């Protein structure tokens, strides 16, 4: 979920989300340009993950960075191909890097923070 600078919320499913490294996740944004513009003006993002068959779930509060080309873009696209979430790294779309700031339970209890007592 994202929010514009004016506070207008936006939410959508992302089927190409990957864990990129120990501090970040990433995905390919294929949606309308408005989704990318909203991330550029307000990079605060909440990602919900739930696996009902294992009765687990978390909220990830993240800060997004947009990559339309360059080495970070290519690294994310290559990882998506490696994980079979894309068939090829054809250079289309936008790579979104999400630095994880906080991990919470689905009930809002803080499990882990990048910076203690982070005001988010």
Task: Show the residue positions of the predicted features.
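Short acidic/glycine-rich loop or secondary-structure boundary segments that cap or lie
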Residues: 8-10, 35-36, 56-57, 106-107
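Buried hydrophobic positions in well-ordered alpha/beta secondary-structure cores of metabolic enzymes
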Residues: 7, 38-39, 98
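Short, structured beta-strand-loop surface elements
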Residues: 32-80
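Short beta-strand segments
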Residues: 1-29
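Short, solvent-exposed amphipathic alpha-helical segments in soluble enzyme
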Residues: 16-17, 42-44, 114-115
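C-terminal edge-of-domain segments
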Residues: 59-120
């Amino acid at each position: 979920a994202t929010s514009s600078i004016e506070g207008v919320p936006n939410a959508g499913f992302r089927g190409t989300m990957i864990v990129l490294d120990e501090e970040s996740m990433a995905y390919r944004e294929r949606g309308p340009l408005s989704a990318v513009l909203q991330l550029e003006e307000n990079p605060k993002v909440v990602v919900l993950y739930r696996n009902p068959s294992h009765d687990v779930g978390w909220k990830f509060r993240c800060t997004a960075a947009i990559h339309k080309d360059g080495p970070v873009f290519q690294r994310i696209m290559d990882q998506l191909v490696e994980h079979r979430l894309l068939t090829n790294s054809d250079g289309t779309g936008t790579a979104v890097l999400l630095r994880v700031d906080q991990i919470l339970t689905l009930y809002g209890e803080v499990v882990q923070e990048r910076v203690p007592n982070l005001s988010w």
